C-alpha cells in the first residue's frame, strides 16, 4: 500500500512496537542506505511535485500517499470481513491458488509486501509446516527404532516444524499490521513470522535476501508501481520469484458489465453498511479500474528486470496472478 515517502521504521519484537535505530535492527534490514544498484534517488520533499490518480481523482503524488494511508487506516478493522462480503468469499480461493502456484520449498524465505492482515503469511506457514510434517513422517517410518521420547522431541520444536522457512510481512500501515498481529496471536502463529513497517517503494532490506516476494491486492495502491517492482527485484535472490495477485481486467463482455454494476453500486454500499465508510470503498473500486491491463502490467514487470514473466487469469480476469523470476544479478 502506498504512503507518504517519509516514514519511521518500526519493528515488532514480541512485546510491542519499537523504533529501529542504528546498531539495533533486524538481520537483513538496511540502515537507510543509498539505493544501491538502482541508483541514488532524491528524497520525496526534494522531488518536483507531479500529478497522479487517486481512484478517478487527480492529486499530487505526495497527496496520494497520505490519502491511501488514510483509506487503509480507516478500513483495517473491517478489512477481512469486507473482503469476504465483497468477493462472496472467493478471495480465499484466489489466495490459496497463489500459494499453490508458489509451492514453497523447505527453507523458503518469503517477503509478503502490503500483507498487513497476514492472509498470505498464514497460508504460507500452514503450507510449509504441512510439507515439513509429511517429510518428518516419511523419515520416522524409515527409523522404526526411535523411542516415543525422540519422536515427541521432533514434533515439539515449533521452529523446526517449518523446516527453516520464514515469512516477513511488510506493510506501510500500522493499523493493518496491528490487525495481522492480533490474528497471529489468536490463531497461534509465532515461529517463522516477523512484522515490519515499511514502504514498498523503499524496502528496508538488504539486496538479494528473499527467495519469494508476494504482494496481494496491494500494488495498485502504490504511487510509483515501477519503483515498487524495482525494489522487489532488488531484494530477491538470483533465482528468486515475484508473485503478484491483483484485480485486473475482465475478459468476458457480459461479465464485465455485471461486474461494473456490482462494483460501483453494491460495494460502496456494503462499505457504508458494514464498515461505515462509503468513500474508502468507492476509492478501492476506482483504483481497480485505473490499474494497468494484464499485458501492460506484464511489460512493467519485465521492465523492472524480471524474466520468464507470465500471468494467469482467475474468475474470467477479475483477478490475475503475475509471476516473474530474477535470473541474474543487477
Swiss-Prot record:
GO biological process terms on file: methylation; ubiquinone biosynthetic process
Main localization category: mitochondrion
Localization in the cell: Mitochondrion inner membrane
A Pfam family assignment: Ubie_methyltran
Binding positions for S-adenosyl-L-methionine per the UniProt entry: 117, 171, 199-200
Location of the transit peptide in the chain: 1-42
Membrane topology designation: Peripheral membrane protein
Membership in a protein family: Belongs to the class I-like SAM-binding methyltransferase superfamily. MenG/UbiE family.
Descriptive protein name: 2-methoxy-6-polyprenyl-1,4-benzoquinol methylase, mitochondrial
Organism of derivation: Bos taurus
